[in-house]
Regions:
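Long, polar low-complexity intrinsically disordered regions
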Residues: 1-29, 34-67, 77-158
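Extended catalytic cores and adjacent scaffolds of nucleotide/polyanion-binding enzymes
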Residues: 72
C-alpha cells in the first residue's frame, strides 16, 4: 500500500548498494542520447569497454523521422558489471555531433533480458528491418550475437 514513494528515486542507481549486492537489477536506461546516434554507433561506444558484459541493447527509433527517441536500454549480464558501466557513462558528454547532451543512467522499469524481449516483441518490431530491432547477445559473456525473434513467433511466412 501507501503512495509508493517517489517513482523516480526508485530508478536511481545507488552504487554502494549495488556493490554490496543489495540491489541486483541489471537493466539500465541510458538517457539523453543525441538523436543522430544509431544503434550501431551506440553499440560500438559501449563495446569499447563493456564487450561481453551485456546481453541486450535497444535504441528505439521514431519510425517517422528515423531518429532515435533519446534513450536506450542495456541489460547487463550481471549486476556486478553495473558500477563500471555507470561510472563510465553517467554524466558523460557524448563525443559525436558535438552535442551538449549529458548522459544519465537510471534503472529501466522492465528488468531482465527475457522480460525485455517479451515486452518489445509485443510491438511491431518483429516486422521492422534489423537496424530497428534490439541487439541480443548470448548471456554467457561470449559476445555471441543471437537472432532477435519475438517469442510469439511473429509472421512465419515462406
Amino acid at each position: 500500500g501507501g503512495g509508493g514513494g517517489d517513482r523516480r528515486s526508485d530508478m536511481r542507481l545507488d552504487i554502494p548498494r549495488v556493490i554490496a549486492g543489495e540491489d541486483t537489477r541489471t537493466t539500465l536506461m541510458v538517457r539523453h542520447i543525441p538523436n543522430k546516434y544509431t544503434q550501431r554507433m551506440l553499440l560500438s561506444v559501449i563495446e569499447q569497454n563493456h564487450s561481453g558484459q551485456f546481453d541486450l541493447l535497444y535504441l528505439p527509433i521514431d519510425f517517422k523521422n528515423r531518429c532515435n527517441v533519446g534513450y536506450a536500454f542495456v541489460n547487463m549480464i550481471s549486476f556486478h558489471h553495473v558500477p563500471a558501466f555507470y561510472r563510465e557513462f553517467h554524466r558523460r558528454k557524448w563525443e559525436r555531433f558535438n552535442s551538449d547532451k549529458v548522459c544519465e543512467i537510471n534503472y529501466g522499469r522492465i528488468q531482465g533480458k527475457r522480460a525485455l524481449i517479451a515486452h518489445f516483441s509485443n510491438s511491431s518490431l518483429a516486422n521492422e528491418d534489423e537496424s530497428m530491432q534490439p541487439v541480443v547477445f548470448a548471456s554467457d559473456g561470449s559476445g555471441t550475437r543471437e537472432r532477435w525473434h519475438s517469442p510469439g513467433g511473429g509472421r512465419r511466412g515462406f
